[in-house]
Structures are given as C-alpha cells and as structure tokens.
Regions:
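Alpha/beta-hydrolase superfamily serine-hydrolase fold, recognizing
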Residues: 2-269
Length: 269
C-alpha cells in the first residue's frame, strides 16, 4: 500500500498483513513512516518495533534501516514494525524538541484503532536515532509504553567533558540544540542527555559502542550504564574493541545480531 497524502484509509483488515510505505503522520513532507502490520494482529498483544535512523539529527533517511525493517518482519512475524522519517534539523530549526514531538506524533498515529496494535514498543536507533530513542524512552514516555531500547552508538551525556573538549562536538550538536554552546546553556545540554533522564521506570536497554569511534567518546557508554545501574534498570552493553561508529568487523556484526535477538527474545517476544 502506498500512502502519499495524509492517511485516509479507514480500516486495515486485521486478518491480513499490510506493508504501508510513506504513511503520513503529519503535514510536513518528512513526517512519513513505513509500517508493517502482521496478520491476526490485535490491540492487546501485537507489539511494535520502532526504528529511528541516524544522521547527526540533520541527515539520514528511513531507507537506511530497510534491511533491519525486513529482517525484523521475517524474524518476528507476529510483531508490527514502524520505520520512521522525522523532520531533519536545519540551521534555523534544531532537532530538539521537534524530533521528539515527531516520535510522539507517529506513535499517536499507530495507536488509532484502525491499526489494531498494542501500546508496547521496542525502539531501535543508530547514532542520533539512538539518542532520540533513549531520550524519548527515558523522558517522554510517562505511560511506560516503551518496553525496551536497542542503542547503537548513541550519544548519552552531552555534558560529558570528553564531549565538550571534542573537536567536532559543537558542529555536530548544532543539529540537535541549534547555535547554543554548553557554556551558554548547560541546563539545555542536560535536558537532552538521555543518561541524565534515566529513572527507575526507564525501559530495559541494550547498547553497543566501538572503542575507536571518531564521533562518540567511550565514556558515553559508561555514563549511560552508570545511570541505568544506579536506577536498577536492566541493561546490557558491549564495547567492540577496535571498531568505529557502528561499522563492526564481520565477527562483531554476528555477535551484535545474536545479542540483539537474545535480548528481544528475553524481553519483547
């Protein structure tokens, strides 16, 4: 099913599966998602994977996650899968808070009765998308509908001194917070730091980092784990030695998949 305009289909037969591409969840051209609806779904038990692409808050596309979208469909045929595009940051319009609002708006869309989906979500994000997944799951999900998060190389604490002293720090973070430095507004930087927003109710989290990532200091993993542990949140974290920004070696790529599947099977099957 192709959806180009605001979605006007009134019902999707729950006895059939659907893959809807470019489903609009808002009026902006970037407020689009791909959505897989499994056969025999219902609003009590059909869980939803939500995929949030990376790209420094200002680039990237849901197409980056097409392989993951298709892989989840085949591995977990009873789950729905949403692959999200969101409004990208521009020089005059930073990612925060509009991208968090977009995640909420997309979730509001799939909560409509016509989709027959439960309010149980597992978020997958890479890089900036992992940051958004964690920030939404930890700070913007008061009803605790997010049950788990897979964080791949996501920034977690933007107040980290390793980050503040990082040569490309301000250039990248401008996509998220606009033309504001840490020293100008430390409260904003804490507000958008997932590790600072962890509570005892935060969703279970599995994280992956590379030890020689040029964009993410290794302290980002330990600061997140410290916050999760302090709040008693179940989590797993893996640092791949010698690997960079999510481009794993073949054996680590295999390990990555095994660990993710095992985590989902444990908590979100």
């Amino acid at each position: 099913v192709k959806e180009d305009s605001i979605n006007n289909v009134t019902s999707y037969d729950p006895k059939k599966s659907f893959t809807i591409t470019d489903l609009s969840y808002g009026i902006h051209s970037q407020q689009k998602m791909d959505l897989y609806l499994p056969v025999n779904r219902n609003s009590d038990s059909t869980k939803v994977f939500i995929l949030i692409h990376g790209g420094g808050w200002s680039a990237g596309d849901k197409a980056d996650f097409n392989d993951l979208f298709n892989g989840l469909k085949s591995t977990y045929p009873d789950h729905a899968v949403m692959n999200l595009n969101y409004q990208l940051a521009t020089p005059g319009s930073p990612g925060y808070p509009k991208q968090i609002n977009d995640i909420q708006q997309a979730i509001d869309e799939i909560q409509l009765p016509k989709y027959n989906l439960s309010k149980q979500y597992f978020l997958f994000g890479a890089s900036a998308g992992a940051h958004l997944s964690m920030l939404y799951g930890y700070a913007f999900d008061p009803n605790l509908f997010v049950k788990g998060i897979c964080n791949t190389v996501g920034p977690t604490d933007l107040t980290d001194t390793a980050y503040i002293n990082h040569p490309i720090y301000n250039a990248i973070l401008g996509g998220l917070v606009g033309n504001v430095t840490y020293s100008q507004n430390p409260a904003l930087y804490a507000e958008v730091s997932p590790a600072k927003r962890v509570t005892t109710d935060s969703p279970k989290t599995i994280s992956f980092y590379g030890s020689v990532d040029p964009l993410i200091p290794v302290t980002q993993m330990s600061l997140l784990q410290k916050a999760l542990d302090a709040n008693g949140v179940e989590s797993e974290a893996t640092m791949y030695m010698g690997d960079g920004h999510g481009n794993w070696s073949p054996e680590n790529a295999q390990d990555y998949l095994v660990k993710i599947i095992s985590f989902i099977d444990k908590y979100f099957k």
